[in-house]
Amino acid sequence: MEYGACSPNGLLELGGDPQALIQVRTRNAADALAAAHDILACPHVGALLLEIEGMPKCLDLVASRRLSLAAAESGVTAFLLRHGAQAQPSAALTRWQVDSMPSQAKDDDWGNPVFAAQLTRHRAGGLGSFSMKWNPANACFETPDIGAVVAAPADRPAHQKIAI
């Protein structure tokens, strides 16, 4: 992983089993793609998280199609994280952009992680934006409580452009 490694403690807090995690580090994107294909061919793999920096030439439409077919054949969910890359054609079923959001911290803890997720591509349609909060106790995402919201003004539109 270019941006660090999965933290066993963090994975445990999110409801995962750190002992079930296998991390593979490669020297370059081509080796990472080869390792991903090997992993997708293994039985008993729950998911694959492949992280690639930028837009390497080896990750073209053909390579993404091969990954997609291997994942479909094995039944393994494959995630491709691309840091510092522009959107480009791929064989992915979906494309998401995920950003962090402020969590609702309480006096006794940091609060659970909250994300803004945008589904930017889906072969079957149905694009949209979602706010989601991770609930580690139930190991699922929930709609975050955004707290108090100011009522819209009755005498004017809620959003008003102001000339400066």
Regions found by a protein language model. Name each.
Residues 1-164:
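N-terminal regions of ATP-driven nucleic-acid and macromolecular assemblies
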